[in-house]
């Protein structure tokens, strides 16, 4: 990726010259200049120069920058007036085991622990605050602790179209505004059809995205996301591995299948994935096999109990952050030669998510490609 380290505002107003315009050269014709402008790459010609920096969590390279939200009393979904009106309605949508109310003090300690883990690994941490009593046009915000809804792709932020949670409407817009106002990162696209929750998607190589067809995604929304981020990925190829988990709402306690890709599968190293077998249909498993991926299967009990053993966050190939109480799965990951940094995730799972879900990933370095995976010798 091109590194942009000088914002236009650092130049004196009278210091600009025609040579500062990328497409300009002495003697260029009007037609040649216009055509060159039309053909310029959006990410390297516009988005990154506007931001004055590189950004995007595409791929599985080293993670360098994130954002978190410190929970407040307004972060607790079960304290929402709408939730109290019909807890069974929301519990039916989510389907996860009920572990009781969220302990705010413990939730804040978990957040500090996670931030410390990032900082100890050289990752810059930003903090996102919401207004007092945050609400959208339909009621109080719910689930806005999950800053993955504001995750930044190469090219810019993406506005979600949520599949089934009315309390999330407006969250990705707010986080996109935060990214623009705080980091100068522009929006890339808004999903306007169907359903697409990009923050719960993930990548298993520099040019391989994982999505689902589920309560959170349909084909219309998926097509719109893939069309946008594939054009700004900076890779010659771009693949979308589409899972089809058997689940009506968010989570199926009987099987452990989830509507979100990042609860079902995540990269832990070059060509190594931690997976929930219940979410892998035949086509997905065949594609992974044919492309030389090694599958580390999560412990089925930990997956069904929504301990979120697959919801690890890759810091760099061969190093992940994981939930501390996923003992069996974490050992399997270690046995695969991967370093596991364990942090507490008790309260975030009560809020129906995991460690990876709550992190806005702002920037990753370019990392291993699908060619690297295909060339790996392991079987």
UniProtKB/Swiss-Prot annotation:
Catalytic class of the enzyme: hydrolase
Catalytic activity: 2-nitroimidazole + H2O = 1,3-dihydro-2H-imidazol-2-one + nitrite + H(+)
Database matches in Gene3D superfamilies: L-arginine/glycine Amidinotransferase, Chain A
Catalytic center residues: 357
Temperature dependence: Optimum temperature is 24 degrees Celsius.
Domain of life: Bacteria
Catalytic activity, EC: 3.5.99.9
Pfam families from the UniProt entry: ADI (PF02274)
pH dependency: Optimum pH is 7.2.
Keywords linked to the UniProt accession: Antibiotic resistance, Hydrolase
GO molecular function, one term: hydrolase activity, acting on carbon-nitrogen (but not peptide) bonds
Record flagged with keyword Cell membrane: no
Keyword Hydrolase: yes
A single GO BP: arginine deiminase pathway
Function: Involved in the biodegradation of 2-Nitroimidazole (2NI) which is a natural antibiotic and an analog of the synthetic nitroimidazoles used for treatment of tuberculosis, Chagas disease (also called American Trypanosomiasis) and cancer. Catalyzes the hydrolytic denitration of 2NI to produce imidazol-2-one and nitrite. It is also active against the 2NI synthetic derivative benznidazole. NnhA confers drug resistance to 2NI.
Protein name, entry field: 2-nitroimidazole nitrohydrolase
Gene: nnhA
